């Protein structure tokens, strides 16, 4: 996967204004759950991924499943070339009263507006790929719109470029960007709301490290492997 080409392509994308409601803060939703002793799960929808995942059901079918469970928010892949995503999926999910994270390779602050227009409440920024000033501009534009930002890192060195503001969450994605394998060691990092991403499934959820405020879970929920049901049964969410 050529990440540079994805970022260049994303600079050419746009999306017209189609919001039908105000912002719902994903960060505040997770904090509220934490206050009641729960963790926040962000359920992710994607049609395919470079790691080999392919799903054959629609965003509507996915939403009808996850909205029956106690999730904190939705993460929707909108990148078209490698994930077969679309801003239109955000428009569809926007009818539900739940925070939506627009997950994409956000190249600049202008792209934040497109996520907002589609109905997103938060955007993803990958610290590994952007310089500090670009990250700052994205976070500030999101703040202007009332949106949250999930600053994601894969390599711990990328944390040097994090930009902290009151609308920021910090996420560690366990998937190595070079070989797409999972890192079993989870680094220590600070933040008001910390999110663990990738690799959570029914096979390991019983050993879930509960020191995080939230968890972004994709493939296992898409496969309906019982992870959500287990987390509810144990009172974690």
Curated annotation (Swiss-Prot):
Signal peptide: none annotated. One of its GO terms (molecular function) is indole-3-glycerol-phosphate synthase activity. It is an enzyme of class 4 (lyase). Keywords: Amino-acid biosynthesis, Aromatic amino acid biosynthesis, Decarboxylase, Lyase, Tryptophan biosynthesis. It catalyses: 1-(2-carboxyphenylamino)-1-deoxy-D-ribulose 5-phosphate + H(+) = (1S,2R)-1-C-(indol-3-yl)glycerol 3-phosphate + CO2 + H2O. InterPro entries: Aldolase_TIM (IPR013785), Indole-3-glycerol_P_synth (IPR045186), Indole-3-glycerol_P_synth_dom (IPR013798), Indole-3-GlycerolPSynthase_CS (IPR001468), RibuloseP-bd_barrel (IPR011060). It holds the Pfam family IGPS. Gene3D superfamilies: Aldolase class I. The keyword Lyase applies. Transmembrane segments: none annotated. The keyword Lyase applies. NCBIfam families: PRK00278.2-1. Belongs to the TrpC family. This is Indole-3-glycerol phosphate synthase.
């Amino acid at each position: 996967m050529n990440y540079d080409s994805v970022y260049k392509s994303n600079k050419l994308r746009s999306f017209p204004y189609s919001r039908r409601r105000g912002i719902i803060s994903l960060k505040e939703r997770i904090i509220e759950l934490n206050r009641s002793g729960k963790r926040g799960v962000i359920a992710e929808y994607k049609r395919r991924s470079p790691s080999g995942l392919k799903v054959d059901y629609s965003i509507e079918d996915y939403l009808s499943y996850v909205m029956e469970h106690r999730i904190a928010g939705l993460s929707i892949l909108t990148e078209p070339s490698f994930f077969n995503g679309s801003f239109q999926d955000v428009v569809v999910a926007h009818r539900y009263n739940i925070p939506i994270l627009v997950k994409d390779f956000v190249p600049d602050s202008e792209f934040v507006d497109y996520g907002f227009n589609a109905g997103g409440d938060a955007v993803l920024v990958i610290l590994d790929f952007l310089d500090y000033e670009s990250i700052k501009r994205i976070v500030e534009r999101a703040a202007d719109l009332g949106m949250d930002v999930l600053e994601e890192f894969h390599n711990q060195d990328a944390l040097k470029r994090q930009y902290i503001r009151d609308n920021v969450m910090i996420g560690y994605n366990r998937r190595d960007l070079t070989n797409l394998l999972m890192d079993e060691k989870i680094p220590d990092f600070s933040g008001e709301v910390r999110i663990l991403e990738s690799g959570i499934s029914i096979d390991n959820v019983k050993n879930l490290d509960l020191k995080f405020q939230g968890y972004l879970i994709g493939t296992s929920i898409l496969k309906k492997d019982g992870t959500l049901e287990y987390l509810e049964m144990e009172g974690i969410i």
